[in-house]
């Protein structure tokens, strides 16, 4: 009997977790819920996608969510021009007391160069 109660409780908890609503990070229309930090790159929406336009010779620019998230699944496609170095930050922060608000934390590397480090994860700015 105890095993049945525990199993029933576990199944109920698992069903409750699966029933939670997903919250998309990007609505496909505008940058509501996002903010730009640090550099001077521009971001716009083209064909339901976020497009970043680099400003050569300026510090790294970060487009961040306005809200913090706990557990998440991040899926994305990317296109990048040759010669650029880019990435997607995850579990990163920007605090005034750390290098004047410099975004720091883990980055999923997007690297079209010969070394081809795309997919690598490194610690940005620390």
Provide a role label for each language-model segment:
Residues 1:
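Structured alpha-helical
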Residues 4-14:
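Sec-dependent N-terminal signal peptides
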Residues 19-126:
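Carbohydrate-interacting regions of secretory-pathway proteins
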């Amino acid at each position: 009997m105890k095993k049945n109660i525990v199993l029933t409780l576990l199944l109920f908890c698992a069903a409750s977790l699966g029933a939670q609503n997903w919250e998309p990070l990007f609505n496909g229309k505008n940058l509501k819920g996002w903010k730009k930090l640090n550099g001077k790159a521009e971001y716009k929406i083209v064909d339901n996608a976020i497009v970043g336009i680099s400003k050569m010779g300026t510090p790294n620019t970060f487009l961040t969510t306005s809200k913090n998230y706990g557990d998440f699944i991040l899926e994305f496609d990317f296109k990048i021009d040759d010669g650029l170095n880019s990435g997607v930050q995850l579990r990163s922060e920007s605090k005034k007391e750390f290098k004047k608000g410099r975004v720091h934390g883990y980055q999923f590397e997007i690297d079209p160069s010969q070394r081809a480090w795309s997919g690598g994860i490194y610690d940005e700015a620390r």
